[in-house]
Every structure is written in C-alpha cells, then in structure tokens.
Amino acid sequence: MIAHLDGPHPDLSPDSADPGQIWALLDKLASSPAPPPYTTAVAGTPSGAARLHGWAELLTAPPGDLDPGIRDRLHELAELEATWPGLAHGDRIVHGDLRADNMVRDHHRGVTFVDWAHATTGPACIDAASLAPQLILAGHTPQKIARLLDEHPATATDPRATTAFLAALTGHWHRNARKPAPSGAPGLRAYQHRVATAGTALLTLRMNN
C-alpha cells in the first residue's frame, strides 16, 4: 500500500511522547495473528531475522577490540544465538527493520511504520526487541529498556525467544561492524559499533537477571 504521510520522523528520546505511541502500535500489531491479506502478501518471503548471527564467527577469532566482559562470554553468547532459528517462527506481523527513519509521525495518524521491505511473519518479540537498542542510542538507559522488555506483552510472553533474538541481533551487529566499510556509506560501521554496544548492554542485563 502507498499512502502520503505528512510529518517528521519520531523522536525516540526519553523526554518525547513518541516512544509511548510506538509501543502502543507494537502492542496492537502483536496482540493477534497477522490477517490473511498480510500473510498472503508475505508468503514465501524468507525471514531475515531468522538468519541473524555473529557470535559463533567471532568466537573462532575474537577481535582485539572486543570488550573483555563479552570476550569471556563468547561461548555462552554463541550457544544462546544458536537457539534463535528454532524460535524464530510465529504468526505475528513483523516489520523487520524498525528505526526512527522507518517511521513517520503523521500530523493526522500519529506514528506510522513505513518502508516494509523486510515484512514477514514471526514471533511477537522481533520488532519490539530490535527497537530496544535504538531507544538506548536515543538516550534511554539500558536498565529502563530492560524493564520495559520485561513488562511489554510482545517481549514478556516468551522471554526465552526475546533473549535469543537479542543475542542473534547483537552478534550480527558486532560481526558486521568489523567488516571493511562499504563505498558510499562512510558512517555505517561506526553506527553498527554503537548499536552493537547498546544491544550488548541490554543483553548482558537479561543474561545476568
């Protein structure tokens, strides 16, 4: 569907009301199975989320710049990541790439998710958990976001899947951040390092809980 939306990207910072709207929209999407028209439209689309990984590769040759606390837990992280593909299936709507620049705060509709290039179905936790590191980058504390994931229906219903997904996602970021910079995207690797750090802070809290 193509629609005209009039407004800026939402503000994810702690002082903004936009994160509350976003979580309410995530609640709505995760509360019931995807409707038939949606499942028909995405049928046969492979889930990119199910293929996320990185820790197992880093375990074979740990980078010198890896935080010592993470280095000491590489075996545990690789094992946790390996459980994710078996948990990655579900019947909920999955956007698959939630960031502020894939949302618009329309003047009439409020916050709306856009750019559904990775749309598929899967467990309810994917979009909420993938948004969590973005909120930390926007200024929320890892402790606050960890509590939010513990309470949010999309991520609290199956905490094992949520933690496994976060492990796979952060491993993906850490692995990609250490690849050569692609031409035409000079800031990509620096961004990946930042979001990997944010995701790892959140993941560590969940693993220590």
What do the PLM-derived regions correspond to, one by one?
Residues P19-I22, I70, L74, Q192:
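Hydrophobic packing residues in well-ordered alpha-helices of helical domains and bundles
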Residues H193-N209:
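Regulatory N- and C-terminal appendages and interdomain linkers associated
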Residues M1, L25, L98-A100, R105, ...:
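Hydrophobic alpha-helical membrane segments, chiefly transmembrane helices and signal peptide h-regions
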